[in-house]
Amino acid sequence: MQQFLHSMKHYAIFFAVIAALTYVLTLVLGADKVDLDKYSTVTITKGDTLWELSNKYHNHHHLTTNEFVKWVEDVNDLNSDTAQSLSPGDKLYIPVLKKELHNQVAIEQ
């Protein structure tokens, strides 16, 4: 009987560790998710670069140019090569809240 209890104790510890790891992984992996519905999209025109987009929208975000570029690359699954070869018509999410651009348009009208 004592051996059975000892064995059950090991199973309980094992399952507690698995549950804790699952919880931590859920928090860590879920933290990187971005709610894209909140962010603006832009349509690339000829000659656009991520650096130019950062400068164009600098009044609407609080990132450095490098942070802006990194955010756009990460969220849009771009690497440095694909970021260099943007094509007119490509649509990209940018780290500018939709409400920020909406407010700007309302002010200008």
From Swiss-Prot:
- Positions in coiled-coil regions: none
**UniProt keyword Kinase present:** no
Q: What is one process in the GO biological process aspect for this record?
A: SOS response
Q: Which Pfam families match?
A: LysM
Where it mainly occurs, coarsely classed, is cytoplasm
PROSITE patterns reported for this sequence: LYSM
InterPro entries named among the record's database cross-references: Cell_div_suppressor_YneA, LysM_dom, LysM_dom_sf
- Annotated keywords: Cell cycle, Cell division, Cytoplasm, DNA damage, DNA repair, Septation, SOS response
Q: One cellular component GO annotation, for this chain's record?
A: cytoplasm
Location comes to: Cytoplasm
LysM domain: residues covered: 40-94
Ranges annotated as spanning the membrane: none
Family in the record = Belongs to the YneA family.
Q: What this chain does, per the record? A: Inhibits cell division during the SOS response. Affects a later stage of the cell division protein assembly, after the assembly of the Z ring, by probably suppressing recruitment of FtsL and/or DivIC to the division machinery.
Checking HAMAP family in the record gives: YneA
Protein name stated in the entry: Cell division suppressor protein YneA
Classification lineage: Bacteria, Bacillati, Bacillota, Bacilli, Bacillales
